């Protein structure tokens, strides 16, 4: 059995770790709430642009943007949004599994897959598997802006415009609630047609006067919308990351507490055994006299 001093040292070490995990839990909770606010603030913007795009594209303007045109799929692009840091449970692994399943399905159909990756964890993962990474970006921090994501987003959009890829999918962790996040893999371009069945009659009137020309307006709207979708997925993934980290750190803090209790019990037993030995030695010494 370890000595009382050794056990005390272990208890102090675990208590120190417990303080760190508790602090990380509190920080993650604060960051998650701030990210949720940003996520809620950006969603109406994306939804409004999406509706306007649907209206403009259905007008008789004699123009079809490449982002709205289906074509034969020979090469697929996959833009994966991961985290820069770890200690967030199985968040990244679950996303990577979902992405690899999608890639497997495409390859079984004879389709080539190229990836673009946001986040250091994703870059390291796909590089280790030998994937060709068309574009990458890391170090986005806790408060990303649309501007800093434009580089990787435009790289993937340009690949589609230049027929280097025939479809682009966006993969990220979708924030459901504090205890639940799920991987999401959705088609980004060609843009899926908006379901207008639930719109009222006023919203389905397409006869508008456009300024500037509908073509210019549609080009700009599509670009802004796709950029907002990439931003939205990054913010969504950040909220998922902080929620997963909060849960992981809470579990670590609770486990540290249980370990401290177990070590304290061992320490008490060791101390009891030490006191018993001392008493036995005293009694034996008295008997010898």
UniProtKB/Swiss-Prot annotation:
Name it: ATP synthase gamma chain
Query: What is the predominant subcellular site recorded for this chain?
Result: membrane
Q: Which organism is it from?
A: Actinobacillus succinogenes (strain ATCC 55618 / DSM 22257 / CCUG 43843 / 130Z)
Q: Which HAMAP family match?
A: ATP_synth_gamma_bact
Keyword rRNA-binding tagged: no
Q: Which SUPFAM superfamilies match?
A: ATP synthase (F1-ATPase), gamma subunit
The similarity comment for this entry is:
Belongs to the ATPase gamma chain family.
Which terms under GO biological process does the entry name?
A: proton motive force-driven plasma membrane ATP synthesis
Task: Please give the function described in this protein's UniProt entry.
Answer: Produces ATP from ADP in the presence of a proton gradient across the membrane. The gamma chain is believed to be important in regulating ATPase activity and the flow of protons through the CF(0) complex.
């Amino acid at each position: 059995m370890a000595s009382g001093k050794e056990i005390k040292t272990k208890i102090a070490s675990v208590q120190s770790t417990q303080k760190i995990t508790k602090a990380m839990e509190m920080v993650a909770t604060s960051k998650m709430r701030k990210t949720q606010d940003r996520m809620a603030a950006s969603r109406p913007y994306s939804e409004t642009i999406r509706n306007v795009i649907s209206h403009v594209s259905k007008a008789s303007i004699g123009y079809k943007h490449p982002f709205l045109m289906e074509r034969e799929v020979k090469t697929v692009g996959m833009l994966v949004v991961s985290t820069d840091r770890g200690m967030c449970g199985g968040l990244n692994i679950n996303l990577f599994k979902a992405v690899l399943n999608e890639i497997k399905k495409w390859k079984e159909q004879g389709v080539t897959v190229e990836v673009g990756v946001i986040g250091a964890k994703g870059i390291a993962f796909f590089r280790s598997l030998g994937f060709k990474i068309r574009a990458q970006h890391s170090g986005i921090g806790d408060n990303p802006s649309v501007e800093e994501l434009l580089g990787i987003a435009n790289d993937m959009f340009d690949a589609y415009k230049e027929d280097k890829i025939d479809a682009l999918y966006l993969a990220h962790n979708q924030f459901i609630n504090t205890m639940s996040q799920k991987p999401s893999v959705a088609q980004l371009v060609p843009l899926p047609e908006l379901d207008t069945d639930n719109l009222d009659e006023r919203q389905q009137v397409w006869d508008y006067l456009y300024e500037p020309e509908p073509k210019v307006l549609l080009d700009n709207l599509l670009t802004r919308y796709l950029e907002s979708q990439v931003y939205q997925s990054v913010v969504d993934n950040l909220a998922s990351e902080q929620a997963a980290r909060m849960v992981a750190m809470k579990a670590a803090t609770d486990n540290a507490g249980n370990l401290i209790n177990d070590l304290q019990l061992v320490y008490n037993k060791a101390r009891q055994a030490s006191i018993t030995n001392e008493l036995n030695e005293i009694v034996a010494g008295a008997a010898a006299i």
